[in-house]
Structures are given as C-alpha cells and as structure tokens.
C-alpha cells in the first residue's frame, strides 16, 4: 500500500479551453467523476489490464517492442509517463460554466504526477496556465510546478518542515516496538517549533 500524495490543481485560461479540458477529463457516464492521467496521457492498450510483473514472456516482449516497457507498472511509474502507479485517484474539480479557472484536488501513489506528464498536457493546452502543489507527509516532502506553453516555468520540491521530518523519523524508530514511552515522543508547540518532553 502506498503513501498517498495530496495534490492541488489550479488551471487558468480562456473559457473555451477550460470547457474543452473539463470535457476531456470528465467521465461521460458520471459528470461528477474525473480522471486526469488516463484521459490526458492514456496508457498504451497493450499494457492495459495486464499483470505486473508480466508473466507471459511473449506478451512482455511485444509490450517492450511497442512501448519500451514490459508491463503497466513499469510504464505508469516511468517519470516520462505518469510517474506514479495508478495515475490520479479521488479527483475532484470545481469550475462554473463561464469560468476561466479550474480548481482541483486529487491523490497519487507515493509522489505527484510527473513533470513530463504535465509538460505533455501543457503542450496539448498551451494557452492554459497550470499549477500543481503537492505534499506527501509519509516521506515528508512537498513542492509545486507551473506550466504554460508546453514548458515547465516553475518547479520546486523540498522536505517539509523539520518538525514533520523528525516526527516521521520518530515514528519509524518506534514502529516495531510494542510500547512507545512518552519521553520518546516529539511534542509540537504552537510556534511551529518542536520539543521533546522531559529528558
């Protein structure tokens, strides 16, 4: 089971392109469901529904010949494709009919959708300004990307606050122990700093 990365999406652009984008990612049978990865960069058909790792060597070799990948898992995790196991999950988008903006939220496995994915989307919709913010608390990192005209114009990622990193490390240290003693826990303060309880 992966750590879930939380993602916020903000898109701005001409009203007609906003509508086109929504129509592309909106489920045609359920207007309240959206999929970004599988609609904006579809997985090659030969890999869809297959096993990972690929057990049939003939199928794997044909997949490699067509896609450069032996199974769906390798393709999806490649940073030149989605960069994450399942694409986006639990995707919600908000806009109105005369809108020039879309706001959204979705989750991804282990990390955000790749920069290469968003560059491809930006090449398809060059007049849209696309910004993505992400945070994965399990591994304590966060960041943001911005794209326009088929280019990444801003990219930054870093560890989150030192307190969060130390908290993650403390949890990791004690994850296998039966009892965690209070003196070993990190106690947050409202100032954003941290302190451990009595030494």
Language model region names:
Residues 1-199:
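Intrinsic low-complexity, intrinsically disordered or marginally ordered coil/linker segments
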């Amino acid at each position: 089971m992966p750590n879930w990365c939380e993602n916020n999406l903000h898109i701005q652009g001409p009203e007609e392109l906003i509508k086109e984008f929504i129509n592309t990612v909106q489920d045609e049978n359920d207007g309240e469901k959206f999929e970004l990865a599988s609609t904006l960069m579809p997985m090659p058909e030969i890999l869809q529904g297959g096993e990972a790792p690929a057990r049939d060597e003939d199928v794997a070799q044909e997949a490699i010949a067509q896609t450069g990948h032996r199974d769906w898992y390798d393709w999806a995790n490649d940073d030149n494709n989605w960069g994450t196991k399942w694409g986006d999950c639990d995707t919600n988008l908000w806009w109105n009919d005369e809108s020039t903006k879309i706001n959204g939220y979705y989750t991804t496995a282990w990390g955000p959708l790749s920069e290469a994915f968003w560059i491809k989307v930006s090449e398809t919709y060059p007049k849209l300004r696309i910004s993505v913010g992400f945070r994965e608390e399990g591994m304590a990192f966060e960041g943001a990307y911005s794209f326009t005209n088929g280019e990444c114009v801003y990219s930054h990622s870093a560890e989150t606050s030192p307190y969060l990193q130390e908290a993650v490390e403390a949890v990791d240290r004690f994850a296998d122990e039966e009892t965690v003693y209070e003196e070993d826990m990190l106690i947050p303060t409202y100032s954003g700093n941290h302190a451990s309880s009595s030494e």
